């Protein structure tokens, strides 16, 4: 008998090979579904997907709430479970889709935190040295703020993606979707300086074409970038909550605050749905209200 665990491996393979989803998305699916399957097998004592019912899933969601999971976390789990069971039905590995009448809890969209322009300038000016690490860190921060790309896209850049003389970079976003993003003079100079005077020294005996590397000469990881960002933010006394996406959020917010077209920002960010980009318009409206309340004599 085919087990639910076997089905999970088939599902993840399909998402990677057939749909071309990113490794981060695959890992997220895997984490949520492994927890779900563990519950189904251990608590409900179900081994086959054909025996999973709507009640099974509702029990699992109740279990997540008892654990104190946030609605956003539960909504993500339901989305993964639904996608999994739809796949099983399509592949005739199940007789029905038990998620049909299971509603996804509405997750309240939290507004992304953006740095002020002054905070961004302080952060970007923090790597001051001419050593390879300072040149690398400066190039990464300038490029992130200049393009709004995701950290996973930044660390995935290869030498053939960088077109400094033409003023753009090419990056592969979610689902391997390619996009071309313009970059300004400051970011161009920072990347040029790193490539000319930093990368070669960090590479040591390694041989690959990733742009940003660690002290072993290997491609930099997300964890490596995150560690660097936290340290630099601490150096310039930025005490706001930071995430690896902070500069991406700041890029979008500052463009819109200065009158950029929403569709153009959507394209640069690589958002499939403009409603995702519209979150940033709420950020700018919140900022406007704060300015009004602070400076208007009759506010």
Curated annotation (Swiss-Prot):
The keyword Amino-acid biosynthesis does not apply. GO terms for molecular function: DNA binding; tyrosine-based site-specific recombinase activity. InterPro entries: CB, DNA_brk_join_enz, Integrase-like_cat_sf, Integrase_catalytic, Integrase_recombinase_N, Integrase_SAM-like_N, Recomb_XerC, Recomb_XerD. The keyword Cytoplasm applies. One of its GO terms (biological process) is cell division. GO terms for cellular component: cytoplasm. Residues 2-89 form the Core-binding (CB) domain. It holds the Pfam family Phage_integrase. Residues 110-293 form the Tyr recombinase domain. It comes from the Bacteria. The active site is at residues 150, 174, 245, 248, 271, 280. Forms a cyclic heterotetrameric complex composed of two molecules of XerC and two molecules of XerD. Site-specific tyrosine recombinase, which acts by catalyzing the cutting and rejoining of the recombining DNA molecules. The XerC-XerD complex is essential to convert dimers of the bacterial chromosome into monomers to permit their segregation at cell division. It also contributes to the segregational stability of plasmids. HAMAP family: Recomb_XerC_XerD, Recomb_XerD. Belongs to the 'phage' integrase family. XerD subfamily. This is Tyrosine recombinase XerD. It comes from Halalkalibacterium halodurans (strain ATCC BAA-125 / DSM 18197 / FERM 7344 / JCM 9153 / C-125) (Bacillus halodurans). The lineage of its organism: Bacteria, Bacillati, Bacillota, Bacilli, Bacillales. The gene is xerD.
């Amino acid at each position: 008998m085919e087990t639910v665990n076997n089905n999970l491996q088939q599902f993840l393979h399909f998402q990677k090979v057939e749909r071309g989803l990113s490794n981060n998305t695959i890992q997220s699916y895997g984490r949520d579904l492994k927890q779900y399957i563990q519950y189904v097998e251990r608590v409900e004592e179900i081994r086959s997907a054909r025996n999973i019912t709507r009640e099974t899933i509702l029990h699992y969601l109740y279990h997540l709430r008892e654990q104190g999971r946030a609605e956003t976390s539960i909504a993500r789990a339901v989305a993964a479970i639904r996608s999994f069971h739809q796949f099983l039905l399509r592949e005739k590995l199940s007789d029905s889709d038990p998620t049909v009448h299971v509603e996804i809890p509405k997750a309240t969209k939290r507004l992304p935190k953006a740095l002020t322009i002054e905070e961004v300038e302080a952060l970007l000016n923090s790597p001051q040295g001419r050593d390879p690490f300072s040149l690398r860190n400066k190039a990464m921060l300038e490029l992130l703020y200049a393009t709004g790309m995701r950290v996973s896209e930044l660390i995935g850049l290869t030498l053939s993606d960088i077109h400094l003389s033409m003023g753009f970079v090419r990056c592969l976003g979610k689902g391997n979707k390619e996009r071309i993003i313009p970059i300004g003079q400051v970011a161009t100079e920072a990347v040029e300086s790193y490539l000319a005077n930093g990368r070669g020294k960090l590479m040591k005996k390694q041989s690959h074409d990733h742009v940003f590397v660690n002290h072993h000469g290997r491609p930099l990881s997300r964890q490596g970038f995150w560690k660097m960002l936290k340290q630099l933010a601490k150096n310039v006394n930025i005490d706001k909550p930071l995430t690896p996406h902070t500069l991406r959020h700041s890029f979008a917010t500052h463009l819109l605050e200065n009158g950029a077209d929403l569709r153009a920002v959507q394209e640069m960010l690589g958002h499939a749905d403009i409603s995702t980009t519209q979150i940033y318009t709420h950020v700018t409206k919140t900022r406007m209200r704060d300015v009004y309340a602070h400076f208007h004599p009759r506010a």
